[in-house]
Amino acid sequence: MSLPDKAFPVSWDQFHRDARALAWRLAGLNQTFKAIVCITRGGLVPAAIISRELNIRLIETVCVASYHDYVNQGDMVLLKGIAPELMENGGETVLVVDDLTDTGKTAAQVRTMLPRAHFACVYAKPKGVPTVDTFITEVSQDTWIYFPWDMGFTYQEPIAKGAG
């Protein structure tokens, strides 16, 4: 599999630093979160880091699938919903965590379930920015982020070779 022109590979170390930066930003909100709802699968890793840093013990998942072929975003499929007790009061004490907001479709679907929750992600693309409350790094819409859990060691052509 060759990398697209605008590839953004993220190492484990970089992702850990960025997820901790997100935790710092969230801590600065002076808001008490009683639970994290992570959007799986991408939200699992940042949720683990953020839950440790903010001492949030209750972690729930919501399973929404949209990338069925790892390339193109397709129809949203809700595979697992959220525990009813976390949906009380619109989820006002809930922190929703994901790795990335791309088009914002996934966050928008989850926001219908938790309209008063705080939505946070590590990375954001312009179309997804309006659907989250807090993020760390914005990348262009046509950039493909390669997360460390999706990658092995691969060779990348130098940028200058593709500019020709």
From Swiss-Prot:
GO terms for molecular function: guanine phosphoribosyltransferase activity; hypoxanthine phosphoribosyltransferase activity; magnesium ion binding; xanthine phosphoribosyltransferase activity. It is found in: Cell inner membrane. Guanine binds at D102, I145. 5-phospho-alpha-D-ribose 1-diphosphate binds at R41, G42, D98, D99, L100, T101, D102, T103, G104, K105, T106. Purine salvage pathway enzyme that catalyzes the transfer of the ribosyl-5-phosphate group from 5-phospho-alpha-D-ribose 1-diphosphate (PRPP) to the N9 position of the 6-oxopurines guanine and xanthine to form the corresponding ribonucleotides GMP (guanosine 5'-monophosphate) and XMP (xanthosine 5'-monophosphate), with the release of PPi. To a lesser extent, also acts on hypoxanthine. NCBIfam families: PRK09177.1 (NF006613). This is Xanthine-guanine phosphoribosyltransferase. It comes from Rhizobium johnstonii (strain DSM 114642 / LMG 32736 / 3841) (Rhizobium leguminosarum bv. viciae). The lineage of its organism: Bacteria, Pseudomonadati, Pseudomonadota, Alphaproteobacteria, Hyphomicrobiales.
